[in-house]
Amino acid sequence: QRDGGVPVRCKSGHAFMKECMRNNDVLYGGEMSAHHYFRDFSCCDSGMIPWLLVTELMCRSGKKLSELVGERVAMYPCSGEINRKVADSAAVLAELGKKYADGEQDHLDGLSVAYDNWRFNVRVSNTEPVMRLNVETKGDKELLAAKTAELLEVIGGEEA
């Protein structure tokens, strides 16, 4: 936004990302699963382009990769994608929606709930019989651990 960009939210998944990017003239799209999509690459996923860009950033900044990653992780610690096998994903989504009704909810891709200092998304996978959970906080690792544990308690199921 600082440089004139406008964020566009898209549903996760290759086909959804490509369609959303084309419909909104998006330059770049990324998923927590480390998929990176580029308009100049026909809105396709590439793992090589991000590494070339990171290498360029390392050269320009003079920082090591561990420093660059450490800065980002300190600002926005996240759980990473946690997969759970559950018997009834619709029931889990409904229960989470009720439990976290006081947060700002969105249903673009599963259930996303945002609070002032943390947020989460839980959705049914497009490719596997699992639910995927991502949790993020603003600089608070303890809150991240507590909220991740709290959400997993509600989601239940088994590790996938």
Each model region followed by its residue ranges:
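Phosphate-binding and adjacent anionic-ligand microenvironments
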Residues: Q1-A160
